[in-house]
Amino acid sequence: MPYIGCHLSSAKGYEAMGRVALSIGANTFQFFTRNPRGSKAKAIDEQDIARFLELARNNGFGTLLAHAPYTLNPCSADPSVARFAAQVLKEDLELMEHLPGNLYNFHPGCHVGQGVEKGIELVADQLNDVLSPEQKTIVLLETMSGKGSEVGRTFEELAAIMERVDLKDKLGVCLDTCHVYSAGYDIVNRLDSVLEHFDAVLGLERLRAIHLNDSMTPFSSFKDRHETIGKGSLGEQAFINIINHPVLRELPFFLETPRDDAGHGEEITWLKEHYRN
């Protein structure tokens, strides 16, 4: 059975997200720990979390994926921006301990003229500051499309960040299908080769989640424009290949396509229909 979900609004709490997930045929989901623009996180509601955890157990939910706010820039040259990112990451990881054993995903950020090497150094330094040996959450670096001065466009850049981090066992990678295709990794025609390269550079054991997104822009465009599954430049067959690939099929899949909950339900149904049991 595949673990497939989508990004859901956390405005009404965890139990509500779980019930929405069930209503659209999902058995996992992604959520923001706070407003995606980075405002203060909501207070923990232990009863809400307890109700959700019971619902998740009773319905066979897979691993959840929390997503950091988009505004975070851990490798900013502005000390105040970097401090804000560190504060949010620390607070979010404390929150995630109430949902033990799940995943937390973030964008490495933009070096904004400092150079990729400096960006890598700053991201790693920040991870060394916020990760703890006791935490039960795996932090995922997301593969990026390479727009502007983004860090994390190549597998080598992600590996360089990890190499500098002390608690490597607390790290993993979330592969975004739109991003890697836009970054020049041909997962449409050469999926096996891309995964072999990932394994050689990072190790497939680091791959912990997949963002399933088609792309509005062509291959190697270095753009980040998500599209509905099968409606973009990747096409339907690419996603059939991805969800059934022996290396990927047991991972949790998360849709971030430009659809509402009902639309995501349609995509989830289609993906399940094409998943080979």
From Swiss-Prot:
Binding site for Zn(2+) 1: 67, 107, 142
Catalytic reactions on record: Endonucleolytic cleavage to 5'-phosphooligonucleotide end-products
Entry's Gene Ontology BP terms: base-excision repair
Binding site for Zn(2+) 2: 142, 176, 211, 256
Enzyme class: hydrolase
The organism's taxonomic lineage, starting at the top: Bacteria, Pseudomonadati, Verrucomicrobiota, Verrucomicrobiia, Verrucomicrobiales
Enzyme Commission numbers on file: 3.1.21.2
The entry's keywords: DNA damage, DNA repair, Endonuclease, Hydrolase, Metal-binding, Nuclease, Zinc
Cofactor binding, per record: Binds 3 Zn(2+) ions.
The protein's required cofactors: Zn(2+)
Similarity comment: Belongs to the AP endonuclease 2 family.
Positions of Zn(2+) 3 binding: 179, 224, 226
UniProt name for this protein: Probable endonuclease 4
Coiled-coil ranges per UniProt: none
One of the Pfam families matching this protein, by short name: AP_endonuc_2
Its job: Endonuclease IV plays a role in DNA repair. It cleaves phosphodiester bonds at apurinic or apyrimidinic (AP) sites, generating a 3'-hydroxyl group and a 5'-terminal sugar phosphate.
NCBIfam families in UniProt: nfo (TIGR00587)
Molecular function GO labels: deoxyribonuclease IV (phage-T4-induced) activity; DNA binding; DNA-(apurinic or apyrimidinic site) endonuclease activity; phosphoric diester hydrolase activity; zinc ion binding
SUPFAM superfamilies registered for this protein in UniProt: Xylose isomerase-like (SSF51658)
